[in-house]
């Protein structure tokens, strides 16, 4: 592990400016042993570390920069059901059972986030209510088709808003011909959520280290038995050797 990476300790974002109690984690001062090493401190890596620690595993998570310096701490915070493509598109790309699995995973993601926020009491400004808006009639027809498709698959949280004047009264502009309201999608403050995951993972026993870049992975018989890579394969100027499966 390399502790000499150029870092972005000052996150310099509106999300960071809203937070006074940012968690801080050290860089390691000696060699470390663990059962599972997680590389990358974004949503995916931190959730993996939390879940593994909650299930009794000895976990270390290392982050080359500081927690929240990448996309997980800087994104739009949208908490939305489904995928960017509809189920018909997914079904054309995959066998039926795999397409259904992918679809179900996307639809359950919001519920998993909600459960995690409640269980760990994460204050991340989670709010529900989301509008998919249509600028013209063709887009509105696509949204109505989405409404019908999701309803057939058992998702009953969508409401079509196809009265332009009524919609304008809610959102303050008449630029849209209509919208689809999703009562089970919403928004979070992503950096607060990530910090909440980090605190929960640490409380569960995961060891978290910042400013700790991984430059190489070697398979040895007496170190971490598993390594989970949840970051870019080539952070900055580092070289990275993947562990053989």
Regions found by a protein language model. Give the residues of each.
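N-terminal Rossmann-like FAD-binding beta1-loop-alpha1 element of flavoenzymes
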Residues: 36-60
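Conserved small/polar residues in nucleotide/adenosyl-binding loops
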Residues: 230-235
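Extreme N-terminal leader/targeting segments of oxidoreductases
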Residues: 1-36
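Conserved beta-strand-loop-beta-strand element in the redox core of flavoprotein oxidoreductases
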Residues: 218-229
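Glycine-rich FAD pyrophosphate-binding loop
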Residues: 57-74
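Hydrophobic, small-residue-rich alpha-helical packing segments that form membrane-like cores
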Residues: 154-157, 164-180, 184-186
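Helical element adjacent to the flavin cofactor pocket in flavoenzyme catalytic cores
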Residues: 179-218
């Amino acid at each position: 592990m390399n502790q000499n990476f150029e870092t972005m300790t000052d996150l310099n974002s509106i999300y960071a400016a809203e937070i006074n109690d940012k968690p801080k984690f050290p860089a390691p001062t000696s060699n470390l042993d663990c059962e599972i090493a997680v590389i990358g401190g974004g949503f995916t890596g931190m959730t993996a570390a939390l879940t593994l620690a909650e299930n009794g595993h000895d976990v270390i998570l290392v982050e080359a920069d500081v927690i929240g310096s990448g996309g997980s701490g800087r994104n739009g915070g949208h908490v939305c059901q489904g995928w960017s493509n509809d189920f018909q598109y997914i079904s054309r790309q995959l066998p039926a059972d795999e397409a259904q699995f992918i679809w179900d995973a996307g639809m359950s993601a919001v519920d998993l986030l909600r459960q995690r926020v409640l269980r760990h009491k994460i204050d991340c400004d989670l709010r529900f209510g989301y509008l998919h808006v249509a600028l013209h009639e063709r887009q509105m027809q696509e949204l109505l088709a989405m409404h019908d498709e999701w309803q057939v698959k058992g998702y009953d949280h969508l409401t079509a808003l196809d009265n332009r004047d009524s919609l304008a009264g809610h959102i303050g502009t008449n630029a849209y011909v209509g919208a689809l309201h999703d009562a089970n999608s919403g928004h979070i403050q992503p950096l607060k959520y990530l910090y909440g995951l980090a605190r929960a993972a640490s409380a569960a026993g995961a060891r978290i280290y910042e400013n700790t870049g991984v430059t190489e992975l070697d398979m040895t018989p007496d170190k971490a038995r598993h390594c989970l890579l949840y970051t870019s394969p080539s952070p900055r100027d580092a070289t990275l050797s993947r562990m053989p499966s």
